[in-house]
């Protein structure tokens, strides 16, 4: 049986005018800034806050296969299912990054009949937010180099500049570069490097800001480097926070689009969860809470990454609670964690599902540690067998875990009604949502708490560089920030080949980065990179554009 591609399904779908989508949740035309017929930005100053804000449902996942487990698909499909049940609902997602789109993912707007549209636009340049973030980031680099070239009044040590340039592309050749070469007229030579745009602190700040004033304040607190006597230098010292905020004045506004079934969707911000905090913007989530009774959102990768950061960074900063958490599981991921090779994942193997269930079990238990009852969604794939699915259901029943088979890829919202009903039961019950740790704990103890309680590790080892940074950060007054772990998404450990639910392992913190503007400390583990590379056969090889301007190969 031949199935339509995600792009084919998207192209065959009928879009409603964006003003009609806006009107369905009470957004006035005065608050709408259209970008064509089917997408718009929202002027949040013209949205009336409501006292009884919508309840937030977070979608996370078990540790994924390289292809992903359909978390965005389930997020959109669950929102469509609530829509099917006549609930007042919105979905809030991150924006896709071009690097992974051309690399391995091929797009990130959901899949099948559970997508947000217009799919081509969202996956490519959308409303220009990533370009604005890239420009603001690189403008700061230019201001830093110009300051040094023009006499270096602040005494910046060019050997200790922490700020890097960024590009919205996977490009390993740019990880380490030299700038300022070619003689005195071209600036002061120094080592530099590029991160991918989604790892930029500007991206994190945009996603954690509540207003333009908040954006400007956070930008002013960015630590760009140090003086020769190791004193931090901030954007406020350079006096360019106003200029950088001006570049972002439109990017900070949430983007409104729609699902295939007409569910209103806010797609805004896009930090990765393995190298950044992995959540869409607070502004988008809060705007949705002012407009809808239920807000379905997602956080990148598994409970060990995006979900943990959602609870300990985003929800803490925004000041809202979670009503429910959905953990997406797939039969293929369970088999992978049960020891099955990638090429054999389509073959029935109930024993491997049994062996791999420990990974899902740990993710479920992780959510419980935050005081919220999880609901498991088995995201159905065509190669799943009844025996494999029934084993997972029986495991859930034995362990008193809520579960639903979810067929939103094939059936849209109708395929998610069982899941929606399970989530509604959880939403109606009180919970004791809380972060994992208190901010007053020392940085090393916060890291140890994440590693031992969420990852299942036994010990954290800090490199000599990280130990010096811990001491320096404490002296600088940065000890009370939350922690943002940078770690492989494929394993609970820092070794991506260690699958299942390993325990007793050590995690090494090789380096720390102070994101004093965003307000968290990044702890880099293992071989994690903040500028990815492309695979041997990138998804770009299958992409093209027709003579009449339609994309081919986005999936």
Curated annotation (Swiss-Prot):
It is an enzyme of class 6 (ligase). Its EC number is 6.3.4.3. Keywords: ATP-binding, Ligase, Nucleotide-binding, One-carbon metabolism. InterPro entries: Formate_THF_ligase (IPR000559), Formate_THF_ligase_CS (IPR020628), P-loop_NTPase (IPR027417). PROSITE patterns: FTHFS_1 (PS00721), FTHFS_2 (PS00722). One of its GO terms (molecular function) is formate-tetrahydrofolate ligase activity. Gene3D superfamilies: Domain 2, N(10)-formyltetrahydrofolate synthetase, Formyltetrahydrofolate synthetase, domain 3, P-loop containing nucleotide triphosphate hydrolases. One of its GO terms (biological process) is tetrahydrofolate interconversion. ATP binds at residues 65-72. Pathway: One-carbon metabolism; tetrahydrofolate interconversion. Pfam families: FTHFS. It catalyses: (6S)-5,6,7,8-tetrahydrofolate + formate + ATP = (6R)-10-formyltetrahydrofolate + ADP + phosphate. Belongs to the formate--tetrahydrofolate ligase family. This is Formate--tetrahydrofolate ligase. It comes from Staphylococcus aureus (strain JH9). The lineage of its organism: Bacteria, Bacillati, Bacillota, Bacilli, Bacillales.
């Amino acid at each position: 049986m031949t199935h339509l591609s995600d792009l084919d399904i998207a192209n065959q779908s009928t879009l409603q005018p964006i003003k009609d989508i806006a009107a369905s949740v009470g957004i006035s035309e005065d608050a709408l800034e259209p970008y064509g017929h089917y997408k718009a930005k929202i002027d949040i100053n013209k949205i009336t806050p409501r006292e009884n804000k919508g309840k937030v449902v977070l979608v996370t996942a078990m540790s994924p296969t390289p292809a992903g487990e359909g978390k965005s698909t389930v997020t959109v499909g669950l929102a469509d299912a609530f829509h099917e049940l006549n609930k007042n609902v919105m979905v809030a997602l991150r924006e896709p990054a071009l690097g992974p789109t051309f690399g391995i993912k091929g797009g990130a707007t959901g899949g099948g009949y559970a997508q947000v549209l217009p799919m081509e636009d969202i996956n490519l340049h959308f409303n220009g937010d990533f370009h604005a973030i890239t420009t603001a980031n690189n403008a700061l680099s230019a201001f830093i180099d110009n300051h040094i070239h023009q006499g270096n009044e602040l005494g910046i040590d060019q050997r200790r500049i922490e700020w890097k340039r960024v590009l919205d592309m996977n490009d390993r050749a740019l990880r380490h570069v030299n700038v300022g070469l070619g003689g005195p007229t071209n600036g002061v030579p120094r080592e530099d490097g590029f991160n991918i745009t989604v790892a930029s602190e500007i991206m994190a700040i945009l996603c954690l800001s509540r207003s333009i004033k908040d954006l400007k304040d956070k930008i002013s607190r960015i630590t760009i480097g140090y003086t020769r006597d190791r004193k931090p230098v901030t954007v406020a010292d350079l006096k360019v926070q106003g200029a950088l905020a001006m570049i972002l004045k439109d990017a900070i506004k949430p983007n409104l689009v729609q699902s295939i079934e007409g569910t209103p969707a806010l797609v805004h911000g896009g930090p990765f969860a393995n190298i950044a905090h992995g959540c869409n913007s607070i502004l988008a989530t809060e705007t949705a809470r002012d407009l809808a009774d239920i807000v379905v959102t997602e956080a990148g990768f598994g409970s060990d990454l995006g979900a943990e950061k959602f609870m300990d960074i985003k929800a803490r900063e925004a000041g809202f609670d979670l009503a429910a958490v959905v953990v997406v599981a797939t039969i293929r991921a369970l088999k992978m964690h049960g020891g099955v090779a990638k090429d054999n994942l389509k073959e029935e193997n109930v024993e491997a599902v049994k062996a791999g269930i420990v990974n899902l079990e740990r993710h479920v238990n992780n959510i419980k540690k935050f005081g919220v009852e999880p609901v498991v969604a088995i995201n159905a794939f065509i190669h799943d067998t009844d025996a494999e699915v029934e084993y997972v259901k029986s495991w859930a029943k034995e362990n008193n875990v809520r579960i639903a088979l979810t067929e939103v890829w094939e059936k849209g919202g109708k395929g998610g009604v069982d899941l929606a009903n399970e989530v509604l039961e959880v939403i109606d019950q009180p919970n004791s949502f809380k972060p994992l740790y208190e901010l007053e704990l020392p940085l090393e103890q916060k890291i140890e708490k994440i590693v031992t309680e969420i990852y299942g590790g036994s010990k954290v080892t800090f490199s000599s560089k990280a130990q010096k940074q811990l001491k320096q950060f404490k002296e600088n007054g940065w000890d009370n920030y939350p922690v943002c772990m940078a770690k492989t998404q494929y394993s609970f450990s820092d070794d991506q080949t260690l699958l299942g639910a390993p325990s007793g392992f050590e995690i090494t913190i090789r380096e720390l980065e102070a994101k004093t503007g965003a307000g968290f400390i990044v702890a880099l583990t293992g071989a994690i990179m903040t500028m990815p590379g492309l695979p041997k056969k990138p998804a770009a090889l299958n992409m093209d554009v027709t003579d009449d301007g339609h994309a081919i190969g986005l999936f």
